C-alpha cells in the first residue's frame, strides 16, 4: 500500500515537471509559448473588434442631440412652490404657515433676477411680446454656445415678488409659478383657433402655448373664484421665442419662460383641487404620468 502511494505521488510530480522530456504540466516550453501567443492574439482581436464597434457607434451619436427622439414623451408641466403631496395649506395671518412656500418661490426665481442676466455674451432681449420660435442653428459646436432669451421678473406682475414679498400668501391670494419642463429641440405647437372655442377664457395667439387653471371637480369650479395670469405680454401661456431648447452644452444658462397664476378669491376653509393644463397640438396627457402636460394641486386657505 505504501508503494502504491509513493508511485501515485511520483506520477503527480512527474506530470508537474517531467525532467526527461523537459515538460511542465504536460507541455514543453515551445508548446506553452505557442498557446500563450495564440490566446494573446485571439483576445487582442476580440478587444480590437469591440473597441472598433464602440468607435463606429460613437461616430453616429451626437453629444448635443439624441439621434432618435421618437419615443421622448411630451414635456411635463410643473408648479412652484414644489411641495410634497401637491398640497398648499396656510393661514394668511400666520407667516410660519406659508414661509416654506414663499422661500421655495424665492429660491427658484433667483436666476431670473436682472442681476443674473446682465452678461450680453450669454443673454439677449427677445422682445416684450410673444413671437415665433427662435432658431439658433444646428445642434453642433460650430457656432459655440447659443444665446439665451432674457426673462424679466416684472412680467410676473403681482407674483413677481417685486412689490409683494409674500407672493399673495399674506393676503390669502396665493401665487403659483408654472413652467414647462425642458425637452431638447422641442417646439410647442399652439392649438388652432377653432379648438379653443370651448374655452372662452383662453384667447388665441399663434405664438403662445396657452395654459388654463380650473377646478378639478365639479364642486371645485364654483369655489376657485377669480384666476389671474401673468406672463410675457400679459399672455396666459408660454411665448414661443424661448424655444427650442438647445441643451446644457449649448445653452447652459437657459431660462424657461414662466407663467404666474394668482387665485384672488378662493373659498375659505375648503380644500379645492385645481388642475392646470397646457394646450397644444404636440402636448399629450397620460393617466400614468399626472404631470405630463398638466398637474393638479390642492389649495386650502384657512381662516
Swiss-Prot record:
The modification Phosphotyrosine is found at residue 101. The chain crosses the membrane at residues 35-62. GO terms for molecular function: ATPase activator activity; ATPase binding; P-type sodium:potassium-exchanging transporter activity; protein kinase binding; protein-macromolecule adaptor activity; transporter activator activity. One of its GO terms (biological process) is sodium ion export across plasma membrane. Signal peptide: none annotated. Pfam families: Na_K-ATPase. Glutathionylated. N-glycosylated. InterPro entries: Na/K_ATPase_sub_beta (IPR000402), Na/K_ATPase_sub_beta_sf (IPR038702). The modification Phosphoserine is found at residue 11. PANTHER family: SODIUM/POTASSIUM-DEPENDENT ATPASE BETA SUBUNIT (PTHR11523), SODIUM_POTASSIUM-TRANSPORTING ATPASE SUBUNIT BETA-1 (PTHR11523:SF10). Belongs to the X(+)/potassium ATPases subunit beta family. The C-terminal lobe folds into an immunoglobulin-like domain and mediates cell adhesion properties. This is Sodium/potassium-transporting ATPase subunit beta-1.
Amino acid at each position: 500500500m505504501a508503494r502504491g502511494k509513493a508511485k501515485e505521488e511520483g506520477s503527480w510530480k512527474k506530470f508537474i515537471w517531467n525532467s526527461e522530456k523537459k515538460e511542465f504540466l504536460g507541455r514543453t516550453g515551445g508548446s506553452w509559448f505557442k498557446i500563450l501567443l495564440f490566446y494573446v492574439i485571439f483576445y487582442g482581436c476580440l478587444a480590437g473588434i469591440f473597441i472598433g464597434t464602440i468607435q463606429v457607434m460613437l461616430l453616429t451619436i451626437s453629444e448635443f442631440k439624441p439621434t432618435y427622439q421618437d419615443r421622448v414623451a411630451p414635456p411635463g408641466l410643473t408648479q412652484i412652490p414644489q411641495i410634497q403631496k401637491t398640497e398648499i395649506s396656510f393661514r394668511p395671518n400666520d407667516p410660519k404657515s406659508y414661509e416654506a412656500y414663499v422661500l421655495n418661490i424665492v429660491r427658484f426665481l433667483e436666476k431670473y433676477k436682472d442681476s443674473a442676466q446682465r452678461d450680453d455674451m450669454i443673454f439677449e432681449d427677445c422682445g416684450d411680446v410673444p413671437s415665433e420660435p427662435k432658431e439658433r442653428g444646428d445642434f453642433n459646436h460650430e457656432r459655440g454656445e447659443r444665446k439665451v432669451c432674457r426673462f424679466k421678473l416684472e412680467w410676473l406682475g403681482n407674483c413677481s415678488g417685486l412689490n409683494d414679498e409674500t407672493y399673495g400668501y399674506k393676503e390669502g391670494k396665493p401665487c403659483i409659478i408654472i413652467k414647462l419642463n425642458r425637452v431638447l429641440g422641442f417646439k410647442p405647437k399652439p392649438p388652432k383657433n377653432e379648438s379653443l372655442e370651448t374655452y372662452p377664457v383662453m384667447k388665441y395667439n399663434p405664438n403662445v402655448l396657452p395654459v388654463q387653471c380650473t377646478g378639478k371637480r365639479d364642486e371645485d369650479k364654483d369655489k376657485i373664484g377669480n384666476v389671474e395670469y401673468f406672463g410675457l405680454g400679459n399672455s396666459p401661456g408660454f411665448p414661443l421665442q424661448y424655444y427650442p431648447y438647445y441643451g446644457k452644452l449649448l445653452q447652459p444658462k437657459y431660462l424657461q419662460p414662466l407663467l404666474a397664476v394668482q387665485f384672488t378669491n378662493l373659498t375659505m376653509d375648503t380644500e379645492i383641487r385645481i388642475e392646470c393644463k397646457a394646450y397644444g397640438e404636440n402636448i399629450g396627457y397620460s393617466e400614468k404620468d399626472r404631470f405630463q402636460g398638466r398637474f393638479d394641486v390642492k389649495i386650502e386657505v384657512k381662516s
